[in-house]
Curated annotation (Swiss-Prot):
Residues engaged in binding ATP: 9-12, 52, 56, 159, 165, 168
Main location: cytoplasm
EC number per UniProt: 2.7.4.22
Family: Belongs to the UMP kinase family.
Cited SUPFAM superfamilies: Carbamate kinase-like (SSF53633)
Annotated control of activity: Inhibited by UTP.
Protein name: Uridylate kinase
Organism, scientific name: Prochlorococcus marinus (strain MIT 9312)
Domain of life where this protein originates: Bacteria
Gene3D superfamilies, alphabetized: Acetylglutamate kinase-like
Molecular function as annotated in GO: ATP binding; UMP kinase activity
Length: 234
């Protein structure tokens, strides 16, 4: 099954590559090239990008910042990533619009649902920055929210690992990978793939979640084509 309208969730860490901080232009270019192949097949693609490669609100809060303030700083970090991703996409010929939940009219469009959907219908990629515009909500929750709003058929969470495991595969050799699992299993077992609000939103709106490795070339195209390359939550 090939999906026709997809919400791709990119973590900020995915844009770091092997760097300890910031944005790796080579990784952005690689992601942009993969996305260009997907859009070239008449797939409508929206992207929500995180900001953890620059600033993470929870970490700032743990270090003594006011939580709401820290989250707003994190939202600004996601806008930096969104603009960088737009640049990479446009350099490979993909028409792209950035929409932000917090208005920044000099650098991006404000988030307007109908305008976003119109961009998708015209074959443009829409990158959502600024989270959902409110503190205390993760960019995973933003991805679930935007997916429901634009009627996406699936949320694709691109990560550093090749699926969902019962424990950290980088720390435990006997970690078990799930091919398919239910929303309820993720919630009940507190599997750390997305926060519970994001999972519940997808569950309530019957939006499946595919988790896969972003660093393997061509995986975005394979995921959109419905290939079993990671883990599917439904």
């Amino acid at each position: 099954m090939t999906y026709k309208r997809v919400l791709l969730k990119l973590s900020g860490e995915a844009l770091m590559g092997e760097k300890p901080y910031g944005i790796d232009p080579a990784i952005v270019q690689s992601i942009a090239e993969d996305v260009s192949k997907v859009v070239g097949n008449n797939i409508q693609l929206a992207i929500v990008v995180g900001g953890g490669n620059i600033f993470r609100g929870l970490k700032g809060s743990a270090d003594g910042m006011d939580r709401a303030t820290a989250d707003y700083v994190g939202m600004l970090a996601t806008v930096m990533n969104a603009i960088s991703l737009q640049d990479g996409l446009e350099r490979v010929g993909v028409a792209t619009r950035v929409q932000t939940a917090i208005e920044m009219q000099e650098i991006a469009e404000p988030y307007i649902r109908r305008r976003a959907m119109r961009h998708l219908e015209k074959g443009r990629v829409v990158v959502f920055g600024g989270g959902c515009g409110n503190p205390f909500f993760t960019t995973d929750t933003t991805a679930a929210l935007r997916a429901a709003e634009i009627n996406a058929e699936v949320v694709m969470k691109a990560t550093k690992v090749d699926g969902v495991y019962n424990c950290d595969p980088n720390k435990f050799q006997d970690a078990k990978k799930y091919t398919n699992l239910s929303y309820q299993q993720v919630l009940s077992d507190e599997i750390a793939v997305m926060d519970s609000t994001a999972i519940a939103l997808c569950k309530d709106n019957n939006i499946p979640i595919m988790v896969f490795d972003i660093f393997k070339k061509g995986n975005i195209s394979k995921a959109v084509a419905g290939e079993a390359i990671g883990s599917l939550i439904s």
